[in-house]
Amino acid sequence: DDHVVEPPHLFQEYMQPNLRDLGPQLIETEKGHQVWEFEGATYRQVGMNAVAGRKPETVSLEPFRFDQMRPGCYDIDARIKDMDLGGIWAMLNFPSQITGFCGTVFAKASNHEVGIDAVRAWNDWLFTEWYSKYPERVIPGGITYLGDSDEAVREIRRNAERGFVSVTLPEMPRNVGFPNLWER
């Protein structure tokens, strides 16, 4: 179980060109922190989410900059080196702050096309830059679009066809608008 930190280029590179300006943007705050901005809300790269190799006293809940993080948090080649140092063979990844828990941030997007494309971009980035480079070491855990069950199924199937073996889902699907399984 491992978390990835989405790199600065993810959404600009992997979202459809006509939607990129509406997707998540990495911005710098007045205090010099780097945070994600999406639909008027900000999502911090919280220090507690990227603490590998840091002394506990240097960690806070303040947002980190990418140049303050260990590169293995967001770069797969550096991550593999870190895993080798720790004697770890494989990792099952989970997303970071910008997606929200299980992709809920994108499911709540006011423009569903943008939300769906952000989910696809995240999965395409994970597939292209992490899993494809180290398929024997990365157990790809995708996210899906939780705003529509049919779209969720399409994204899960799309990822399964290319080797994803897991998907991150909320433990209580009814909390994101899916039917309550116990009320059948």
Q: What are these regions, as identified by a protein language model?
A:
Residues D2-R184:
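Helix-coil boundary/capping segments in enzymes
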